[in-house]
Amino acid sequence: MSNSDLFESNMYKEVIKQYDEVTEFINLDSNIRERLKLPQRALTVTFPFRRDEYDEVETVIGYRVQHVLSMGPTKGGIRYASNVNLGEITALAILMSWKSAIVGLPYGGAKGGVAIDPTPLSKQEKQRVTRRYTAELLPVIGVDKDIPGPDLGTDEQTMAWIMDTYSNFVGSPQPGIVTGKPASLGGSITRREATGRGVVAIANAALDKLNLKYENSTVVIQGFGNVGRYAALDSYERGAKVIAVNDLGGAIYNNNGINIPELFKHIAKNKSVKDFDGADNFDDEILEIECDILIPAAVGGVIKSSNAENIKAKIIVEGANSPTTLSADKILRDNGVLLIPDILANAGGVTASYFEWVQNTQNYLWKEKELHDRLIDVLTSAFEEVWIISEKNKVDLRTAALIKGIKKVAAAKLTRGLFP
């Protein structure tokens, strides 16, 4: 059995396949090449959990993976989902390393997860899971060690419980232990919208390269959580036509553009985009609608070889993590679709988290405009660097982004040397 067999999963295989192709292309030293395929730390924990309505005790499994410790503290979200596994968490931690390096953040990548479906949990049940999971992570997390944040199935309330649990163990308030927490506890006022607005900023930078204008574009958004809804709002505010969106409840379409502020009001009342008066319900595949910009902002693996040929977008901006499979990626490139990869396109979230962490550690809050301006500057500068790498090496943007991220992480590893 090889070392990598410990982290077996389809997502891990895809991440390593991409990594192997890029490291072969840049001729990365074979010693460091093998080391970066594996995390430096991978913690598996089990703990008891009792539901509200009966006394039977369940055993819950959780993970925290830290990929690289050479860049600074590690950073990455915590997800709650029934299908969470070590391979998936490891793959996501590796991607966080590349993502942080691409936008110039002083972090290594990390990721955590609990294998439990959060949907049926009461608030008290979710709190018990969170506090016990946090207690199990105490040896490996810390303000200068590893800083969690929200992800699938977790939110700012989850982060508040983690902060409170950790602070009680340490004996003093520790707001910097997590990011993505409520503003009342030192959370960033822009964190919730940062990923979505960052996606649009990156898309706008790409359109500039093509001598196109965002305000003249049509936009389709798959997924209407935080990323999708703020990408939609920013697109609307820039004058683009958002012609289709969807969520778990259904999809809507209006060729003349959807009024996004009015859609927000509809969602507040009806909990879904479906049946919005300003658009038609839509039953066909939303990813295949003809548009200028397609933003997949839901889950991974939605663009695959079976539907890639049918995609009619000019530009795809990956708001979700790993929405495009490797096989689909090649088909899209061959068809002339410009694809901006997740490790660049959705880096607004981790960038805003970094700003939150800096403010917490300095006990000094920045104003909203300063946060927004810094976010856009970081993301557009990173895009410019990746574009130059792409042009220079005649490679697609995903490969160019990986070249930038992997080279930076490898350089830090090699410069620090071996211990002992």
Regions found by a protein language model. Give the residues of each.
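Adenosine-phosphate binding glycine-rich loop
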Residues: 2-10, 206-207, 313-420
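Short, Gly/Pro- and small/polar-rich lid/capping loops
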Residues: 3-46
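Flexible, glycine/charged-enriched surface loops at secondary-structure junctions
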Residues: 29-35, 104, 141-150, 173-176, ...
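Glycine-rich, N-terminal phosphate-binding loop and its surrounding beta-alpha-beta segment
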Residues: 45-118
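Glycine/serine-rich phosphate-binding loop and adjoining beta1-alpha1 elements at the start
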Residues: 81, 100-215
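Glycine-rich phosphate/diphosphate-binding loop of Rossmann-like nucleotide-binding domains
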Residues: 179-182, 187-290
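Rossmann-like adenosine-cofactor binding region
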Residues: 250-339
